[in-house]
Curated annotation (Swiss-Prot):
Family according to the record: Belongs to the glucose-6-phosphate dehydrogenase family.
Catalytic activity field: D-glucose 6-phosphate + NADP(+) = 6-phospho-D-glucono-1,5-lactone + NADPH + H(+)
Protein name, entry field: Glucose-6-phosphate 1-dehydrogenase 1
SUPFAM superfamilies: Glyceraldehyde-3-phosphate dehydrogenase-like, C-terminal domain, NAD(P)-binding Rossmann-fold domains
Origin species: Mycobacterium tuberculosis (strain ATCC 25618 / H37Rv)
Lineage per the UniProt record: Bacteria, Bacillati, Actinomycetota, Actinomycetes, Mycobacteriales
The gene coding this protein: zwf1
HAMAP family membership: G6PD
Amino acid sequence: MVDGGGGASDLLVIFGITGDLARKMTFRALYRLERHQLLDCPILGVASDDMSVGQLVKWARESIGRTEKIDDAVFDRLAGRLSYLHGDVTDSQLYDSLAELIGSACRPLYYLEMPPALFAPIVENLANVRLLERARVAVEKPFGHDLASALELNARLRAVLGEDQILRVDHFLGKQPVVELEYLRFANQALAELWDRNSISEIHITMAEDFGVEDRGKFYDAVGALRDVVQNHLLQVLALVTMEPPVGSSADDLNDKKAEVFRAMAPLDPDRCVRGQYLGYTEVAGVASDSATETYVALRTEIDNWRWAGVPIFVRAGKELPAKVTEVRLFLRRVPALAFLPNRRPAEPNQIVLRIDPDPGMRLQISAHTDDSWRDIHLDSSFAVDLGEPIRPYERLLYAGLVGDHQLFAREDSIEQTWRIVQPLLDNPGEIHRYDRGSWGPEAAQSLLRGHRGWQSPWLPRGTDA
């Protein structure tokens, strides 16, 4: 096993290049990297579909054209990088052919856009033909389906790869506001001074989707909301919101601080979790008629460390809700009643809102007094307006993988810790509550916040209805 440290990749090998992820995300990201002149290596696609390179190029153009206005010169440069290998990834002969095609490439990036059950077999086959020396391997979530399977997967990968050769892809870590979180927190004294238990009374994280499982019924029914978005996306976001400042600029410096947050979190309590399922879910193709899989989950947790002790954290995620929005909302502590006002009713607590998606931005909600009453005043910033066009998550992650930047990828210990945190909810899932499509989930979710701020209407982009 050879160190897979720094240095840019000189070949990108995409396993599953004819799959759904490539069609929706990967080709678009590659095109945008090519447009920005950030792509500098050949691309070899591997899949079971029997097609020519010309057919792959045509399929890539159709995939990109769904969302991008294509510049022919840019696409022609991208097309010139493409080659294709047809075969079964479980067949050892495929890897002999792959070794011949790779030739003199010395630092390939293998991007595994494949079902998780194939991650370890593919990597082990690559090791058998000595194709892992100085290579990096990117694997898409989910990383296991519980703590035991995550431990097993990590053990099999680590048997043939160093930790610095493994890139665990979670596209949420490539979203602009998530990337910017540590800079927002620690580069701005006005925020840094407020960011602890002395000023923050509670934290809410919402990930709402206004659509159902669509054509992913069979996949989703074996996963559910907790595995699909909470164990990975939302706990990673929570760590970035609550971690201490990294002591240096390396990926390990950042991941060390995230891991500290996870270690300070107790396993989730099933009595502080509400699971829901939207009406009509069991009629979706691929979903069991008696399914108890959750399409909505709300939970309460805490971080038992000096900065956050005693601050409740509420997380909710669901499908078929009124809007598509992901946000983090921090409530500041209420100020005392103001004796110099005729009406001594205290102002509503200030709020800091970070909208991750759509139209990323930050809002500071403050109070103003007019006509003997309090009014909320919103100070809003749109990152697209103030910082320019954002880099798309997969574009950012692909580039980071190609140049060997590990900052945007999850580390082994964090994956295992987040599975440890959610494991009690997998072992004791509890009752499933039905809810109407277009609602904010089951009524039972309100009970989690008894004695605290209720679930807030999310901050939506201007002109968006919910």
